[in-house]
């Protein structure tokens, strides 16, 4: 009964959002909001809050905004906040893109309507919009789009042609006495490689966020080719399983490395630092870029904590929209190197000429959005890769292995 009440309340305030033209009442009241975000970014975010207040004032808004900062990071907000109706629950909060299914099920995501949905359509179309879509509607505001990995390498060893394909990369490394690191034993890398030739999963939900069905076709022709690609890479003598920045003593000279380590890779290779999109792989005459996840972070608006106060709920939407807007995303890039997903922010002169941004934008064209991921997708591929490593999975029984993998994925609940 309590859950039913929560969703009826969310539906009510959603109607209010559309009916009131999506603008807080201009009566000069004080609106209190709680914001949950990364502890280390508190000072930066509080500066953005002041920018938001100034922008609201310039727009003729007479309200006063008091914003309390809760140090709850985007990777743990779903498990840290136990009661989304509590007075200290966040109105607006940061979350990793793969948390959307969990938060939707908790009723912690307000559906976007009116100008807020138009904001997503106008500036986040494509990748960003995909990250915040559930059951055909938008439920959050994306504000980053750079949680991925791609090739980071030593240009004194590899040329532009070498890094175009994984075969060329591995062969060149072997010829020069070096190694290529690709962390296939970890699901974020290895599981995503299964997307290479077009195999995928899909999850359908009911209106309460419960999983209705998980579908997957990794046991089909596309999945089989991806499995063979993983097998081929792991059998190459130049391949090693790693994703970290190699030490000066290491023989690794190319890594499928995370965007969070860009600065460290640059420090390691200096002027010889190079970067490129995921290399291609060829199986049975078919050539595709190796699959990868591309995730990001979004700002969720919690409709439960406002308890029917439409001014507070709309103010939360206004804050979330501002913090995911062009100016805020540009400032994150300028201060932290965090790549934006806002279409206009991407056109900033410093980004257009940034090699890492160029690679990221190209990779986003074929990378797999990291949204709600079936739970077993984080474990089943690990079993598969482990079988290749220990020799129990060979080309002779690889179809049987991916049949088992696929059955594990569709039989598990989504996270």
Task: Pin down the residues of each PLM region.
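Short helix-initiation/N-cap motifs at beta->coil->alpha
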Residues: 70-80, 238-249, 260
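Extracytoplasmic/periplasmic substrate-recognition and gating elements
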Residues: 267-335
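Long, aromatic- and glycine/proline-rich binding clefts that accommodate carbohydrate-like moieties
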Residues: 333-387
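A structural signal for short loop-to-beta-strand junctions that line the ligand-binding cleft
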Residues: 81-83, 90-91, 118-153, 179, ...
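Glycine-centered hinge/linker elements that transmit conformational signals in sensory
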Residues: 208-242
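Hinge/lid segment of periplasmic solute-binding proteins
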Residues: 95-149, 161-167, 274-277
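Extracytoplasmic/periplasmic solute-binding protein
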Residues: 137-143, 149, 167-222, 252-254
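Conserved N-terminal structural module of periplasmic/extracytoplasmic solute-binding proteins
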Residues: 14-101, 404-415
